[in-house]
Structure formats: C-alpha cells, structure tokens
C-alpha cells in the first residue's frame, strides 16, 4: 500500500465551494482501479490548508491509472483552480504502524 500526501492551499473564502467540488470529485477517484481510500482534512490552525491522503495499491495506480484516465480531466476541472500554489504530491510507504 502506498500513501499519497498533498497539502492543498485554498483561499478560506472558497472553502465551502472547494469542499462541495471535492465531494463530487471523490466519486471520480474512487472508481479508479487499485484506489483504496482517501481522507481530506481541514487544518485547525491554518484555515487555508487542507491535507489530502490517498491510499493506493501502488504508485502506478495513481501516476498512470488515475492521472492518465479520462476521469482525471474532470477532477482537474473541478479542483485545480482552487489551489494556490499548486501542491506538491508525494508518495510514502509504511515503515512502522501501531
């Protein structure tokens, strides 16, 4: 299992619109093969910041399976205009879990 990590910067005045758009977008990503689950969290200390964590079976499921899918174009249309700056996306493998 791979964990995708992205810190999303969104204008706080757009939070409700962003969250509504993300609610639609989650149906797109959840249909991608080898997607496991995602969590979107809103930062309590910094209202412009969200943390997106997505679990995939492997990196290629995200970088190829999702990003090269027809659904990714719709995902981009729904969400990318909210990000300023555009987020860095990284992938992690579990070392230790309790």
Enumerate the language-model features and the residues they cover.
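Glycine-rich beta-strand-turn "strand-cap" elements at beta-sheet edges
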Residues: 2, 39-51, 76-98
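Active-site-flanking beta-strand signature of metal-NTP-handling nucleotidyl enzymes
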Residues: 3-8
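Short hydrophobic/aromatic beta-strand micro-patches
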Residues: 9, 53-55
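Short, surface-exposed ligand-recognition loops at beta-strand->loop->(often short) alpha-helix junctions
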Residues: 9-19
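Feature marks short, surface-exposed loop/turn motifs that line or immediately flank catalytic pockets
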Residues: 12-14, 44-46, 60
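Generic recognition of short, well-ordered alpha-helical segments
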Residues: 17-20, 51, 67
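An amphipathic, aromatic/His-enriched active-site/gating alpha helix that lines ligand/cofactor pockets
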Residues: 24-36, 55-89
């Amino acid at each position: 299992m791979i964990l995708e990590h992205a810190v999303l910067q969104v204008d706080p005045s757009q939070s409700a619109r962003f969250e509504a758009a993300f609610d639609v977008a989650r149906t797109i990503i959840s249909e991608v093969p080898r997607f496991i689950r995602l969590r979107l969290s809103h930062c309590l200390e910094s209202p412009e910041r969200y943390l997106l964590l997505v679990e995939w079976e492997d990196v290629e499921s995200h970088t190829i399976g999702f990003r090269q899918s027809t659904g990714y174009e719709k995902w981009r249309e729904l969400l990318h205009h909210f990000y300023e700056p555009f987020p860095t996306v990284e992938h992690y493998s579990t070392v230790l879990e309790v």
